[in-house]
């Protein structure tokens, strides 16, 4: 759907004449000039102007002008509510339908409340549907209001602009947030009140206050009041204020029905005798406010003046919603006092008037006391009163601002529209006496004296007691400014440049058509110049731009129509902006040859700027050459070289003057031949008088050679031409025009011979119209005379803008333009090609040929095309026989459309503009969150999901003993809270089926259960449970299975009815059972085991707190619902699910997926199930896998008995991972592959501190003689980054004894160096290296940092090179080893890292540590001990025999004396975990010590002494924090904060427990594998972890058994536990997976038992697809690869792709990238803008990972994690992938 915001936005003043239609002329004006001055002299310091407004309300009213027409017609927009809005509530509960049938479903509704133009604001569809429609409407209406105010939103970016929005409805929030399974990440801000103003502030980049106001129905007028106050206080410069309301749910309507506030027919009848309540309405209104004096200075329209406002409260009344007349009276008086006006001066009141029987009389009587009879006004001068509510409804939070907008319109038009729905005046109001009058018909307000402009009051009240009031005044001073808006007769109008733009290319058709339609409707009432200034200065300029040059409205309409139909037009330009235009425009002044007879005549008469240039040059030309330039312009330029030179120079400066007046100055200038004179003037190198002397006196000298020379353009390169004319005296190359053409100059004979020869050879030759052999040695005889002619005449200056030369070999030379320069300019060849190439190298992409006709534009295009593939423009200014001014404006339009800043877009307050010019046309799409649910009929017959059974509607079958339960099962009403998939299908857990039987047969038992066919949840199916006195059966059928009524039913489960409900035992001795079970399992054992055999999720949220076992028995202490999740009315089903799950693990030694298939007997005792139970499982004496289970309370009372539960294996993939195969790895260092061609470095810059300069000297001597220069620098900022073509920066870290300081300093230095290089424009030619030695522990942190640098910025990162001999400079490794993050020199050979499986210890090895064991007589210490990892490690240690554990953490726990009280969830979890460990016999000591603090060593030693514990036998350093920052964003403080717990903490432990500690069995450092794989953003974390690895190696060398464990993510815990899927996606992208805690501990044990292992890398490499690229080189030896399936087509596609190149490859990649973007963002491919940054299109971090994987699998190339950051648009990505695929 496409809607226009203001296509007919014309506010015609009541006293305005027809010729002012469409302008900003106000309603009140004065013809007295003295009155104007008086108005300006008035003190307006406290006055606030309303300079713009917009609205969207029922009745298809989308603008203030449409609203005014609707009011005049007494429009009534009331009607029926769209029924779909309440459907989710009808579906939510069977009783709702009856209630909703009695709820008022009438009112005032928007037809398109679900519609939004998300693409316009670069909001993804996913986020858009999670945004409250109020946010969407407010955003669009705020944009419309700014356009109405003539403010381009882009001008407000970063400004002190505030947003105050009234809001009171949270219907959408209730609707979507109560649908818990589908709650989305964007719904927080997306549905919050604060999100309404904040969304506007965010998207427009506004820096002022942004506040949501909730004062019920007074909200929006309260918002306006606070906005006014903020402006007056100087708190904000501009305010966007308003309110919005949306009626999306029935809740509040139901409340108001109960309160009797709503009329039965949903209509408002303000002031009518039949008024019995109001009709609720929805919509939005926004006004733009600015201080009045500032508005006048800025040339803004002033719609009205906000003179005063006030807000108060009712205080205590008969009820909180009862009105208080006294409060309403007082707030009105307060507003009048603020406005400094008397109450009898008010002409109109916009009343609140909600149409309630109590409210209307109360309010009217109060207003009469102020404005009516109580004001003392004369009966002949009543005050008119009205209310907008009968027209558009009561907009509640938006009501006040809509009343304000109506009041502004009343003052603008000087009329009061008739009151809608007013039949009989309210008899409870004394209308005759109170001097207030509702308008029954259109009323024209009396003007009164000029000293008293029209005024209006606006009242708005909230049902919570807030009362608000505002006073506005018509602005009588606008006529002063209207004088400068005088209309320009269209017939005499100069050409105008109309600038249109859209954010996406497909919008221009509707935009152009809308403007064309509006111009037709205006019928000449607005000038083309006014339209042009409005579009250029008062509208946003988007990415896709269009410019139209027109000299009449009719011409503009025709061109717009062509643009709308995509028909090319001579005077229409279209382009899109990009980064290429950033440097600005280059003006190129061409030389001899552009002349034509009438070339300056039009401009001389039409352009004052051109005329001034001609008149300035006229006397000089007359004096120097003896002819009149003015006469020549009229008579036509003669064909004489000397005169052509002067007139060409005149045209250059004249066109430049016009161009600067229309476009603004250039960034750089260059001249071609004669054109260098004008370039010198425009750049400031010469004055125009000096340059004119150069041209005229040289032209006079040329007379000697006139008729003696010739020139020709030849289609040969300059080098080819020189070779061919080497044997032809009298000719030479005069101009190097382009790579394929040049101009040859010489004698007439020589040129004649050459031309004939080349034509015979098929070379294109074209004569140049000249008879002088310019730019040849033939002119050397003129050198002396020219020097003499210019002697003492020139005083050249340094140019004030970039000036390039085509006469010098160095086009950037700053050589002064003295006489010698002009001699050289006359004789030397013109080096146009190399000069344009230099400009391109310097970043210029926009070129304008300043000449009367283009003669070198084509050459410029050829040169740029040869030089770069970037977009560029080269445009002429004039074209022979084309209208001159239109042509120049077209050039300005091309610059603007390309993205260059041009003068027409600069805001000029003196230029006329019109708010009636159409604004943005919205391209709406529907975005409305689909809320899950079923129909009311379905709900009425369904089971209750929270009961965790399938018992639906119960029916006793007549004449039988049978009972039938019927229900409907689907995803939304599954009877279990979690997930329970089997082979990809969600099935109902066996526990639910057993619970269904038990509840149906209660209090009897269930026997001989046969679980035959799983009950699948989706697609939807009918369920029947049928039972009699003997049997019970569950059957099901798909809803669509109706072809055979009987055969479509499937028997799922059967059972027989038991005789009694008594278990075989009534009590279990828990302690005795636990005593005989020696094996302690981890609490997560069952979940981990089931995950390993293919159970990816659990149906219920039970959790094991203690688990012991033997070969045949298990005992588990189980929390049935530990997190108190909803969806479980009782806990028995969750406990039964735990029982079936745990029992299936009895056979864990033979891992496979087992499911219950039969149960001999199930009996429940019928008591409430407690939160915590014990489950005792025993293998039965049977030939099959069968178990007996008893569920008891903590005291041992039996709650349920399950006898003979048989399990059968389920066919499918078994993922058992009890072995460490593929799990544990170590880093190996094989020799690196060497490149065939070395990198060449012209210079090596050493970045180092003083202490290492001696080492640098050694390195410099080794480099000598290799043609490589060197330099030494202490600061990265001093590096010579722009002076060498190729350069290596080598960072040498400083050596100190303070390890932590060394680590932090060296990391900071290297990051700073990288940041400096990245900020350099020449970074592709620079490589950054770091050189370290493992002997210095403090440098080891750089290893991790280097790996992240390699990931984030491979374009600058050389590598980190670790030396075995620090005296040998690694030049060979730097030059021959490519794409390596870290290089290790060992045995003189450069090596790179690879992961290889860790070799297990030999069976009888005595070296190295023994298998990890724990002693109850020792103490074990864990840092980070209160984190999830630390707690998990402690739990595992206890299961392995540890009994004394210190948990070190920065945080402290509450005193143990209050542990039994309630605490925050995180603290409660820690306390519960510790207590559960202590119940197992362990002693846990939580100790609050910050291990990274300098006092940590002292504090730790003191704590150990105080606690008097046995010696510490094991240390685990698991402390750490993660703060992701990309390299460019890193700050030293943030980096050190991450390093401290890792490095300082490890050093503290190293000090307290040195390698010589006799009691220490293990010293384990928790590191991360993320550093090896280069996780982006983790530079600080990787640096800290690489230090831990080095510390373990260092301790090993001292005889210790330290180990660093480089973990992948632990599933469900640690720093990735709350990553919302981002971490899992990143792991997948990097080629690995996470591990379960059980796998982690198994790996730990395995590594500890491996001889000599100082580290272990714990991860699983995922299987790669057959054609998928290796995600990281370090995985090369361990990553398995899937076999290519038979018939798999990817290989064929890849082969076809490999055959593509050039344009075909680019087209292929473009299709792929756009498809991947489309899929990721859920938008159509044709809406993917190639030039918009993907984050601006709504792509967040999680989407980015999916996008990368999609690209990687489609293009079969490695896609790095920072790719989208470096190449943010589709265009950039296509360029990058084309380069990669070509290689």
Curated annotation (Swiss-Prot):
Pfam families: Acyl_transf_1, ketoacyl-synt, Ketoacyl-synt_C, KR, PKS_DH_N, PP-binding. Transmembrane segments: none annotated. Residues 948-1064 are annotated as: N-terminal hotdog fold. Pathway: Secondary metabolite biosynthesis; terpenoid biosynthesis. Residues 1707-1781 form the Carrier domain. Residues 948-1216 form the PKS/mFAS DH domain. It catalyses: 3 malonyl-CoA + acetyl-CoA + NADPH + 3 H(+) = 6-methylsalicylate + 3 CO2 + NADP(+) + 4 CoA + H2O. The modification O-(pantetheine 4'-phosphoryl)serine is found at residue 1741. The active site is at residues 217, 352, 394, 673, 980, 1130. Residues 1-40 are annotated as: Disordered. The keyword Zinc does not apply. Residues 1-31 have a biased composition (Polar residues). Residues 1078-1216 are annotated as: C-terminal hotdog fold. Keywords: Methyltransferase, Multifunctional enzyme, Phosphopantetheine, Phosphoprotein, Transferase. GO terms for molecular function: 3-oxoacyl-[acyl-carrier-protein] synthase activity; fatty acid synthase activity; methyltransferase activity; phosphopantetheine binding. Residues 45-474 form the Ketosynthase family 3 (KS3) domain. Residues 942-1215 are annotated as: Product template (PT) domain. Multidomain protein; including a starter unit:ACP transacylase (SAT) that selects the starter unit; a ketosynthase (KS) that catalyzes repeated decarboxylative condensation to elongate the polyketide backbone; a malonyl-CoA:ACP transacylase (MAT) that selects and transfers the extender unit malonyl-CoA; a product template (PT) domain that controls the immediate cyclization regioselectivity of the reactive polyketide backbone; and an acyl-carrier protein (ACP) that serves as the tether of the growing and completed polyketide via its phosphopantetheinyl arm. Non-reducing polyketide synthase; part of the gene cluster that mediates the biosynthesis of macrophorins, isoprenoid epoxycyclohexenones containing cyclized drimane moieties. The first step of the pathway is the synthesis of 6-methylsalicylic acid (6-MSA) by the polyketide synthase macA. 6-MSA is then converted to m-cresol by the decarboxylase macB. The cytochrome P450 monooxygenase macC then catalyzes the oxidation of m-cresol to toluquinol. The macrophorins cluster contains a single gene insertion (encoding for the terpene cyclase macJ) compared with the yanuthone cluster that produces the linear compound yanuthone. This is 6-methylsalicylic acid synthase. It comes from Penicillium terrestre.
């Amino acid at each position: 759907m496409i809607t226009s915001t203001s296509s007919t936005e014309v506010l015609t003043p009541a006293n305005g004449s027809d010729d002012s239609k469409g302008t900003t002329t106000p309603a009140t004006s004065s013809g007295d000039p003295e009155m104007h001055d008086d108005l300006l002299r008035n003190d307006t310091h406290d006055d606030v102007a309303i300079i713009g407004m917009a609205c969207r309300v029922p009745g298809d009213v989308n603008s203030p002008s449409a609203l005014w027409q609707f009011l005049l017609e007494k429009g009534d927009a009331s009607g029926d509510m769209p029924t779909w809005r309440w459907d989710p509530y009808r579906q939510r509960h069977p009783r709702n339908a009856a209630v909703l049938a009695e709820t008022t479903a009438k009112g005032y509704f928007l037809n398109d409340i679900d519609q939004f133009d998300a693409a316009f604001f670069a909001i993804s569809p996913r986020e858009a549907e999670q945004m409250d429609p109020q946010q969407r409407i407010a955003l669009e209406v705020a944009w419309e209001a700014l356009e109405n105010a003539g403010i381009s939103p882009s001008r407000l970016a970063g400004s002190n602009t505030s947003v105050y929005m009234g809001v009171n409805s949270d219907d959408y929030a209730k609707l979507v947030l109560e649908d818990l399974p589908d709650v989305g990440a964007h719904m927080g801000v997306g549905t919050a009140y604060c999100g309404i103003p904040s969304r506007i502030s965010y998207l427009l980049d506004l820096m002022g206050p942004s506040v949501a106001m909730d004062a019920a129905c007074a909200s929006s007028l309260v918002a306006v009041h606070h906005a006014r106050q903020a402006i007056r206080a100087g708190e904000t410069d501009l305010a966007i204020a308003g309110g919005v309301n949306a009626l999306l749910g029935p809740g509040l309507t139901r409340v108001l029905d109960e309160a009797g506030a709503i009329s039965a027919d949903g209509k408002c009848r303000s002031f009518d005798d039949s008024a019995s309540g109001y009709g609720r309405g929805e919509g939005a209104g926004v006004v733009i406010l600015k201080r009045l004096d500032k508005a006048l200075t800025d040339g803004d329209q002033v719609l009205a003046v906000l003179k005063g406002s006030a807000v108060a409260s009712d205080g205590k009344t008969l009820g909180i919603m009862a009105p208080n007349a006294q409060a309403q009276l007082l707030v009105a008086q307060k507003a009048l006092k603020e406005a400094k006006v008397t109450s009898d001066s008010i002409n109109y009141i916009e009343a609140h008037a909600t149409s309630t029987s109590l409210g209307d009389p109360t309010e009217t009587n109060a207003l009469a006391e102020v404005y009516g009879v109580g004001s003392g006004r004369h009966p002949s001068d009543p005050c008119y009163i009205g209310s907008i509510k009968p027209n558009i409804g009561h907009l509640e939070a938006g009501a006040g601002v809509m009343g304000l907008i109506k009041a502004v319109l009343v003052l603008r038009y000087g009329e009061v529209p008739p009151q809608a729905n007013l039949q009989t005046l309210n008899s409870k109001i004394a209308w005759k006496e109170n001097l207030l009058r509702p308008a029954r018909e259109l009323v024209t307000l009396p003007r009164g004296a000029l000293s008293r402009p029209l005024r209006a009051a606006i009242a708005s009240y909230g049902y919570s007691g807030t009362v608000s009031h505002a006073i506005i005044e018509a602005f009588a001073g606008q006529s002063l400014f209207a004088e400068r808006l005088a209309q320009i007769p269209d017939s005499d109008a100069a050409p105008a440049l109309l600038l249109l733009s859209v954010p996406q290319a497909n919008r221009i058709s509707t935009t152009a058509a809308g403007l064309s339609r509006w111009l037709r409707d205006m019928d000449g009432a607005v000038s083309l110049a006014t339209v042009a200034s409005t579009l250029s200065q008062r509208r946003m300029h988007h990415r896709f731009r269009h410019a139209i040059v027109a000299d009449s409205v009719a011409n503009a309409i025709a061109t717009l129509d062509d643009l709308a139909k995509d028909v090319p037009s001579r005077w229409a330009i279209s382009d899109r902006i990009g980064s290429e235009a950033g440097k600005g425009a280059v003006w190129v002044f061409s030389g001899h040859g552009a002349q034509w007879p009438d070339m300056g005549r039009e401009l001389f008469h039409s352009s004052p700027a051109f005329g001034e240039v001609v008149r300035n040059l006229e006397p000089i030309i007359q004096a120097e050459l003896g002819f009149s330039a003015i006469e020549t312009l009229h008579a036509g330029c003669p064909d004489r070289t000397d005169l052509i030179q002067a007139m060409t120079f005149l045209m250059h400066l004249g066109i430049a003057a016009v161009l600067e007046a229309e476009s603004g100055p250039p960034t750089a200038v260059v001249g071609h031949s004669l054109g260098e004179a004008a370039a010198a003037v425009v750049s400031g190198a010469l004055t125009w008088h000096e340059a004119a002397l150069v041209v005229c006196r040289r032209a006079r000298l040329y007379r000697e050679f006139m008729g003696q020379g010739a020139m020709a353009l030849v289609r040969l390169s300059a080098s080819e031409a020189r070779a061919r004319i080497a044997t032809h005296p009298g000719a030479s190359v005069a101009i190097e025009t382009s790579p394929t053409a040049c101009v040859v100059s010489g004698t007439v004979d020589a040129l004649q011979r050459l031309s004939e020869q080349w034509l015979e050879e098929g070379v294109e030759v074209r004569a140049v119209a000249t008879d002088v052999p310019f730019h040849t040695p033939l002119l050397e005889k003129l050198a002396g005379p020219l020097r003499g002619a210019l002697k003492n005449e020139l005083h050249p200056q340094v140019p004030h803008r970039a000036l390039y030369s085509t006469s010098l070999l160095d086009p950037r030379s700053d050589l002064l333009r003295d006489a010698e320069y002009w001699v050289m300019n006359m004789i030397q060849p013109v080096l146009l090609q190399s000069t344009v190439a230099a400009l391109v190298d310097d970043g210029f992409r926009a070129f304008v040929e300043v000449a009367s006709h283009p003669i070198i534009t084509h050459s410029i295009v050829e040169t740029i095309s040869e030089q770069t593939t970037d977009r560029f423009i080269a445009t002429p200014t004039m074209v022979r026989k084309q209208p001159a001014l239109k042509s120049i404006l077209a050039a300005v339009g091309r610059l603007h459309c390309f993205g260059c800043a041009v003068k027409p877009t600069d805001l000029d307050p003196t230029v006329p503009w019109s708010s009636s010019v159409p604004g943005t046309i919205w391209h709406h799409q529907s975005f409305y969150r689909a809320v899950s649910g079923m129909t009311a009929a379905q709900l009425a017959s369904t089971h209750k999901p929270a009961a965790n059974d399938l018992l639906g509607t119960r029916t006793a079958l007549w004449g039988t003993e049978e009972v039938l339960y019927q229900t409907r099962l689907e995803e939304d009403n599954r009877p279990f809270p979690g997930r329970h998939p089997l082979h990809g299908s969600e099935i109902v857990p066996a526990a639910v089926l057993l619970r269904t039987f038990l509840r149906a047969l209660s209090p009897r038992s269930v026997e001989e259960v046969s679980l035959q066919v799983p009950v699948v949840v989706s697609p939807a199916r009918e369920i029947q449970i049928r039972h009699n006195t003997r049997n019970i059966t569950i059957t099901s059928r798909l809803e669509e299975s109706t072809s055979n009524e009987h055969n479509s039913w499937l028997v799922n489960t059967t059972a027989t009815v038991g005789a009694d409900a008594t278990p075989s035992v009534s009590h279990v001795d828990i302690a005795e059972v636990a005593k005989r079970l020696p094996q302690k399992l981890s609490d997560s054992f069952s979940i981990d085991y089931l995950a390993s055999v293919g159970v990816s999720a659990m149906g219920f949220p039970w959790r094991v707190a203690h688990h012991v076992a033997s070969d045949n028995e298990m005992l588990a202490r189980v929390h049935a619902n530990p997190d108190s999740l909803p969806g479980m009315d009782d806990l028995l089903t969750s406990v039964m699910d735990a029982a079936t799950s745990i029992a299936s693990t009895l056979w864990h030694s033979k891992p496979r997926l087992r499911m219950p298939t039969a149960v001999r007997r199930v009996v429940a005792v019928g008591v409430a199930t407690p939160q915590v139970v014990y489950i005792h499982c025993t293998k039965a004496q049977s030939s099959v896998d069968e178990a007996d289970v008893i569920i008891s309370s903590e005291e041992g009372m039996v709650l349920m008995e399950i006898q003979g539960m048989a399990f059968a294996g389920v066919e499918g993939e078994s993922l058992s991972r009890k072995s460490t195969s593929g799990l544990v790895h170590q880093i190996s260092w094989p020799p690196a592959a060497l490149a065939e061609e070395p990198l060449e470095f012209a210079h090596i810059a050493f970045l180092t501190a003083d202490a290492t300069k001696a080492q640098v000297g050694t390195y410099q001597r080794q480099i000598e003689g290799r043609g490589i220069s060197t330099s030494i620098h202490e600061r990265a900022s001093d590096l010579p980054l722009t002076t060498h073509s190729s350069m290596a920066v080598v960072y040498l870290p400083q050596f100190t004894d303070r390890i932590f300081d060394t680590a932090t300093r060296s990391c900071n230095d290297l990051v700073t160096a990288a940041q400096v290089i990245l900020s350099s424009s020449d970074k592709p030619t620079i490589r950054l290296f770091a050189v370290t030695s493992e002997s210095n522990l403090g440098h080891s942190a750089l290893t991790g940092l280097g790996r992240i640098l390699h990931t984030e910025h491979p374009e600058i990162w050389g590598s980190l090179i670790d030396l075995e001999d620090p005296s040998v400079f690694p030049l060979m490794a730097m030059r021959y080893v490519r794409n390596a993050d870290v290089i290790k020199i060992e045995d003189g050979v450069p090596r790179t890292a690879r992961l290889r499986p860790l070799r297990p210890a030999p069976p009888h090895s005595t070296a190295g540590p023994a298998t990890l064991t724990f002693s109850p007589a020792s103490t074990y210490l864990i840092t980070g001990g209160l984190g999830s990892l630390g707690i998990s490690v402690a739990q595992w240690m206890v299961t392995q025999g540890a009994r004394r554990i210190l948990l070190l953490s920065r945080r402290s726990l509450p005193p143990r004396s209050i542990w039994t009280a309630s605490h925050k969830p995180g603290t409660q979890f820690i306390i519960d975990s510790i207590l559960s460990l202590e119940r197992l016999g362990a002693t846990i000591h939580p100790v609050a010590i910050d291990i990274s603090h300098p006092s940590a060593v002292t504090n730790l030693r003191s704590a150990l002494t105080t606690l008097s514990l046995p010696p510490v036998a094991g240390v685990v350093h698991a402390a750490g924090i993660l703060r992701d920052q990309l390299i460019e964003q890193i700050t030293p403080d943030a980096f050190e904060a991450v390093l401290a717990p890792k490095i300082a903490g490890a050093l503290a432990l190293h000090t307290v427990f040195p390698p010589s500690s006799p009691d220490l069995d293990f010293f384990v450092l928790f590191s991360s594998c993320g550093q090896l794989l280069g996780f982006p953003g983790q530079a600080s974390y990787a640096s800290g972890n690489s230090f831990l690895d080095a510390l373990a190696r260092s301790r090993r060398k001292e005889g210790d058994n330290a180990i660093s464990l480089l973990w992948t993510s632990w599933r469900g815990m640690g720093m990735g536990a709350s990553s919302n899927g981002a971490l899992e996606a990143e792991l997948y992208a990097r080629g690995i997976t996470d591990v379960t805690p059980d796998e982690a501990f198994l790996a730990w044990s395995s590594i500890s038992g491996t001889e000599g292992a100082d580290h272990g890398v714990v991860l699983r490499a995922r299987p790669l697809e057959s054609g998928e690229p290796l995600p990281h080189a370090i995985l090369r030896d361990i990553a398995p690869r899937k076999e290519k399936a038979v018939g798999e087509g990817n290989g064929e596609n890849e082969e076809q792709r490999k055959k593509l190149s050039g344009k075909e490859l680019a087209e292929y990649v473009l299709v792929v990238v756009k498809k991947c973007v489309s899929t990721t963002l859920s938008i159509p491919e044709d809406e993917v803008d190639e030039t918009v940054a993907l984050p601006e299109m709504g792509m967040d971090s999680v989407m980015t990972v999916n996008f990368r994987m999609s690209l990687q699998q489609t293009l079969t190339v490695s896609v790095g994690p920072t790719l989208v950051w470096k190449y943010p648009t589709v265009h950039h990505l296509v360029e990058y992938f084309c380069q990669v695929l070509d290689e």
